[in-house]
Amino acid sequence: MLKAVIIDSSAVARGLLNTVLLDGGYDVVGQSHTCAAGLALLIKFNPHIVCIAREQMENGEDVVREIRTKWPKTLIFMVSSEFDAATIQAAHAMGVSGFIVKPFKADTVLNTIRNVVIAMVKRQRAAMAKESGDAAAGDGGEA
């Protein structure tokens, strides 16, 4: 079961997203209303997924960069009611893995997370296959 942390200043939004994730089979190990408390949850639980409100990302200086540095395999999902092309591009450049749109639609949220997880697994498998192929090619010519 994949572990998740939710960081959002809105208790209502945290509660709704918590319900969607739990119903979808995720283990929500913590919720926070601030980036600082959210980072403490990451230290404690080392989650696979972090859902962080756009406002928290804008207020929490370099929080995405810190998560990317300390937990490089953690998937980061930006949560917001509105996304424009510039926001999406900037978020991807920071290391955001995907986007969850408010108001939450359970199927959409779960499909978004599932698709990002599947894409990540495919990338990891391709990288491992490439490494295995490179290693095999290097071993083939030596006696």
Give names to the regions the model predicted.
Residues 33-49:
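Acidic, metal-coordinating helix/loop segments flanking the phosphotransfer/catalytic sites
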